[in-house]
Amino acid sequence: MAISIKSPKEIKALRKAGELTAQALALLEREVRPGVSLLELDKMAEDFIKSSHARPAFKGLYGFPNSVCMSLNEVVIHGIPTDYVLQEGDIIGLDLGVEVDGYYGDSALTLPIGAISPQDEKLLACSKESLMHAINSIRVGMHFKELSQILESTITERGFVPLKGFCGHGIGKKPHEEPEIPNYLEKGVKPNSGPKIKEGMVFCLEPMVCQKQGEPKILADKWSVVSVDGLNTSHHEHTIAIVGNKAVILTER
C-alpha cells in the first residue's frame, strides 16, 4: 500500500488530534507519583479525552482493554493498566492515542517515579534523545531506512539496543498506516533503499530501547512486551508531519 500524502486541511486535523494527545500525556505526567495506581491514571486520561469531545484511540483497538498502554519497568510497550500502585524507583511508559473527528494522534514517554538508578536515568535519556535526534535529522528526499539507521546508531552508541519486531508507523485516518519504520536497519537492507520522505507525510517515530537483548517476549496477558533479558526498558514517541520541507512535531508537550 502506498504512503498517503496529507493535504494542509488534513494536517490541521491531525495537529488538533496531536495537541489533545500531548495534553492528555502532560496531565498524566503531572499526576504520576508514588501511591497512584495505574488504573487511576488510565481513568484520568480517559475522562480528560472524553471531556474534550474526543475518543481514546487505543481502547478496543485490536482488543486492547484500556485507554493508555502503561508499561512498567521491564515492559517496553503495550502494558495493560492494573491496580498496581506506583513505588519510588519504578519507571513507567505511557503510550496513548486520541481520535478527533476521524483523525489520530499518538505519543509516548517513559517517566521516573521519584529517584531512579543511574542506569535507568541513562535508559530514559537514550529513548528520548534518540527520538529527538532522528526528528532533527529528517530531510525531504531521505529514505525511511536512513531514519531507521539513525535511530539504531544513536541507541547503540549509548550502549543499548533497539527492540526487534516492533516499529514506528504512518498515521492519519487510521492509527497505524504505511510505512513501517523499525528502530534498526534490518539485515541485508541498505539505508538508501525503499520509500522516501515527502512533503505532506505524517508518521510516528518511537524508539523502544532495551539494555542487552532486543529480542522480544510477550507475557501471559498476551499484550505486554518485554526483552528476553528481563531488564528495564524505555520508550518515547511523537507524531510528526512534513511541512515546508521540515519535520513538525504534532504531539509536542
Curated annotation (Swiss-Prot):
Q: Which InterPro entries match?
A: Creatinase/aminopeptidase-like, Pept_M24, Pept_M24_MAP, Pept_M24A_MAP1
Q: Where is the signal peptide, in residue numbers?
A: none
Q: Which UniProt keywords apply?
A: Aminopeptidase, Hydrolase, Metal-binding, Protease
- Cofactor-binding details, from the entry: Binds 2 divalent metal cations per subunit. Has a high-affinity and a low affinity metal-binding site. The true nature of the physiological cofactor is under debate. The enzyme is active with cobalt, zinc, manganese or divalent iron ions. Most likely, methionine aminopeptidases function as mononuclear Fe(2+)-metalloproteases under physiological conditions, and the catalytically relevant metal-binding site has been assigned to the histidine-containing high-affinity site.
**Domain of life where this protein originates:** Bacteria
Q: Which reaction is recorded as catalysed by this protein?
A: Release of N-terminal amino acids, preferentially methionine, from peptides and arylamides
Q: Binding of a divalent metal cation 2: at which residues? A: 106, 169, 206, 237
Query: Does the keyword field hold Isomerase?
Result: no
The entry assigns this protein to a family as follows:
Belongs to the peptidase M24A family. Methionine aminopeptidase type 1 subfamily.
State its role: Removes the N-terminal methionine from nascent proteins. The N-terminal methionine is often cleaved when the second residue in the primary sequence is small and uncharged (Met-Ala-, Cys, Gly, Pro, Ser, Thr, or Val). Requires deformylation of the N(alpha)-formylated initiator methionine before it can be hydrolyzed.
Its quaternary organisation is: Monomer.
HAMAP family given in the database record: MetAP_1
Q: What is this protein called?
A: Methionine aminopeptidase
Q: Which gene encodes it?
A: map
